[in-house]
């Protein structure tokens, strides 16, 4: 009898080794190597492979291939359609990740209910809840649709058989880390199980043209659990994020083969489920305390939509040898960089000051155009001088203190004017080449010192 062979696979990065190691050479993680048995391919599989090689299609010139634009299937959640690129594409495999309890299952259950109807049937497969638990959650959301079918199963073979037998219009698998194939020795959620189960679901989606949504767990760092292999295999990767203590939830696309990865959908968690936020700028600014030192407003582009958000800063003398720099919703390295610019180019003595910054509403911002608002908030708190509450700030700040040009300035200014702001501080390079809306004064500044004089009077 032949000896059974095994290999050790890192559960963080997928690195393979013939022997166990405490530290993975690939990613440096400790105690992540798990033993998995090497299974030989059966003779019938090799025969089938050789047969498929003989019958493979011949290469065709790209100009001779006929295509047809199939309409996307839209849900009743416009924000969900926006992030997907306009709706659900037939035959697509969509991965949704997020922290535990953030609302992934709630979102997909609502989407399933909206997609199901007289002509569409949806199969919701839960590996974490029984059918009764899923029904209780559906009752809380007011979902009672006979075209929505629920299955509690984790065996990939039974799941595949159920899809083949029912032939639904849409499928949801919650979650991929609970699904397993019985002929693989490793535990559910391991690299081999996730790879093989995802490959099987992808095969079903592509051959039958069924859109499949799969839920993925995230690690404590916030990324999809396991190696990047799962994200490479699927067509679309969505992250559902938000603060536990806030009602707002944000859906972002980090990979999308059928649309933009810059779009963002905003939802609010209520007792009846998730509802879309149609005017996020107004929601984020409704609790703003106008006239407070350390507060400024900026217009950030999230995909094709400008969103006005409040950036708050608190600067206070440090009680320790090294001052603290903390930021929520903004990269703390950017905060340190901009504080260094204020010290060197403007002369603010911030080396002995603690700095605490946050974006109100739990939004995460990463575009350079918010730099000027961060600088204004820091200087305003340090001088204890509030900026004009009717001012809005846009601009990227360079290391020499210059305020650099940003994109889509006209859309940003129009959004600020729509919400009642009277003055817009923008880069001087952005003043020409577009139509300025009525009712708002647009002022161009060339550097940080000029921006501070304009907004804080000194």
Curated annotation (Swiss-Prot):
Under Enzyme Commission nomenclature, its number is 3.6.4.-
Q: Which residues lie in coiled coils? A: none
Q: Cross-referenced Pfam families, in alphabetical order?
A: AAA_25, ChlI, Zn_ribbon_LapB
Q: Per the UniProt entry, what are the Gene Ontology biological process annotations, in alphabetical order?
A: recombinational repair
SUPFAM superfamilies for this protein: P-loop containing nucleoside triphosphate hydrolases (SSF52540), Ribosomal protein S5 domain 2-like (SSF54211)
- Keyword flag DNA repair: yes
Indicate the secretion signal residues: none
* Phenotypic consequence of gene deletion: General sensitivity to DNA damaging agents. Increased sensitivity to methyl methanesulfonate (MMS), decreased survival after UV irradiation in transition and stationary phase, decrease in transformation with chromosomal DNA requiring homologous recombination. Increased sensitivity to mitomycin C, H(2)O(2), and nalidixic acid; a further disA deletion suppresses H(2)O(2) sensitivity but has no effect on MMS sensitivity, suggesting radA and disA might work in the same DNA repair pathway. Partially suppresses DNA damaging agent sensitivity of recU deletions.
Binding positions (ATP): 98-105
Q: Which molecular function terms from Gene Ontology are attached?
A: ATP binding; ATP hydrolysis activity; ATP-dependent DNA damage sensor activity; damaged DNA binding; zinc ion binding
Which keywords appear in this protein's UniProt record, sorted alphabetically? Answer: ATP-binding, DNA damage, DNA repair, DNA-binding, Hydrolase, Metal-binding, Nucleotide-binding, Stress response, Zinc, Zinc-finger
- Give start-end positions of each zinc finger (C4-type): 10-27
Motif interval(s): RadA KNRFG motif: 255-259
Summarize subunit and interaction data from the UniProt record for this chain. Interacts with DisA.
Instruction: Give the domain section of the comments.
Output: Has a putative N-terminal zinc-finger, a middle region with homology to RecA with ATPase motifs including the RadA KNRFG motif, while the C-terminus is homologous to Lon protease.
- Annotated family: Belongs to the RecA family. RadA subfamily.
Protein name in the entry: DNA repair protein RadA
The top of its lineage is:
Bacteria, Bacillati, Bacillota, Bacilli, Bacillales
């Amino acid at each position: 009898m032949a000896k059974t062979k095994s290999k050790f696979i890192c559960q963080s990065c997928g690195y393979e080794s013939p022997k166990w190691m405490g530290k993975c050479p690939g990613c440096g993680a400790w105690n992540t190597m798990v033993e998995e048995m090497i299974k030989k391919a059966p003779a019938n599989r090799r025969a089938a492979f050789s047969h498929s090689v003989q019958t493979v299609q011949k290469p065709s010139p790209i100009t001779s291939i006929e295509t047809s634009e199939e309409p996307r299937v839209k849900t009743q959640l416009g924000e969900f359609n926006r992030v997907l690129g306009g709706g659900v594409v037939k035959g697509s495999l969509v991965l949704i990740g997020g922290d535990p309890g953030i609302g992934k299952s709630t979102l997909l259950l609502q989407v399933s209910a909206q997609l199901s109807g007289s002509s569409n049937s949806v199969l919701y497969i839960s590996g974490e809840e029984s059918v009764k638990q899923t029904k209780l959650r559906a009752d809380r959301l007011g979902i009672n649709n006979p075209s929505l079918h629920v299955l509690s199963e984790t065996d990939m073979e039974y799941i595949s058989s159920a899809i083949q037998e029912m032939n639904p219009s849409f499928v949801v698998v919650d979650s991929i880390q609970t699904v397993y194939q019985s002929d693989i020795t490793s535990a559910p959620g391991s690299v081999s199980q996730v790879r093989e189960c995802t490959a099987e679901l992808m095969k079903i989606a592509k051959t039958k043209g069924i859109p499949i949504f799969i839920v993925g767990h995230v690690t404590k760092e916030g990324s999809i659990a396991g190696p990047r292999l799962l994200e490479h295999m699927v067509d679309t990767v969505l992250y559902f994020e938000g603060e536990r203590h806030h009602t707002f939830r944000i859906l972002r696309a980090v990979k999308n083969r059928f649309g933009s990865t810059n779009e963002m959908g905003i939802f609010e968690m209520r007792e009846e489920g998730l509802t879309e936020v149609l005017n996020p700028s107004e929601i984020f600014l409704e609790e703003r305390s106008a006239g407070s030192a350390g507060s400024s407003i900026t217009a950030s582009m999230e995909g094709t939509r400008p969103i006005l958000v409040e950036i708050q800063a608190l600067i206070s003398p440090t009680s320790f040898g090294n001052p603290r720099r903390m930021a929520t919703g903004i990269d703390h390295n950017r905060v340190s960089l901009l504080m260094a610019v204020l010290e060197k180019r403007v002369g603010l003595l911030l080396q002995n000051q603690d700095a605490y910054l946050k974006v109100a509403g739990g939004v995460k911002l990463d575009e350079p155009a918010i730099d000027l608002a961060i600088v204004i908030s820091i200087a305003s708190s340090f001088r204890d001088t509030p900026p004009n509450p009717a001012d809005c700030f846009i601009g990227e700040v360079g290391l020499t203190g210059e305020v650099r040009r940003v994109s889509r300035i006209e859309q940003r200014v129009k959004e600020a004017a729509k919400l009642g702001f009277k003055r817009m501080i923008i880069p001087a390079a952005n003043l020409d080449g577009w139509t300025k809306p009525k009712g708002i004064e647009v002022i161009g500044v060339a550097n940080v010192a000029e921006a501070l004089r304009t907004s804080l009077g000194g």
